[in-house]
């Protein structure tokens, strides 16, 4: 999982979700695309 100040979709399969007030990207096609915003 990458932790970044700002998260962006890397492909069409990426989905933006919010968990515990944090924005996250999950991807069914490529698990390398998983990201989380913030500290």
UniProtKB/Swiss-Prot annotation:
- Please provide, alphabetically and separated by semicolons, the GO molecular function terms listed in this UniProt record: structural constituent of ribosome
Q: Which domain of life is it from?
A: Bacteria
- Would I find Ribonucleoprotein among this entry's keywords? yes
* Pfam families from the UniProt entry: Ribosomal_L36
InterPro entries associated with the record? Ribosomal_bL36, Ribosomal_bL36_sp
Gene Ontology cellular-component terms for this entry are: cytoplasm; ribonucleoprotein complex; ribosome
Give the GO terms filed under biological process for this record: translation
Task: Tell me which UniProt keywords the record has, alphabetically.
Answer: Ribonucleoprotein, Ribosomal protein
Fetch the SUPFAM superfamilies from UniProt: Ribosomal protein L36 (SSF57840)
Family classification: Belongs to the bacterial ribosomal protein bL36 family.
Family matches, as NCBIfam families: rpmJ_bact
Protein name (record)? Large ribosomal subunit protein bL36
Which organism is this entry from? Leuconostoc mesenteroides subsp. mesenteroides (strain ATCC 8293 / DSM 20343 / BCRC 11652 / CCM 1803 / JCM 6124 / NCDO 523 / NBRC 100496 / NCIMB 8023 / NCTC 12954 / NRRL B-1118 / 37Y)
């Amino acid at each position: 999982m990458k932790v970044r100040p700002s998260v962006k979709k890397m492909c069409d399969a990426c989905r933006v979700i919010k968990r515990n007030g944090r924005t996250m990207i999950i991807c069914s096609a490529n698990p390398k695309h998983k990201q989380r915003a913030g500290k």
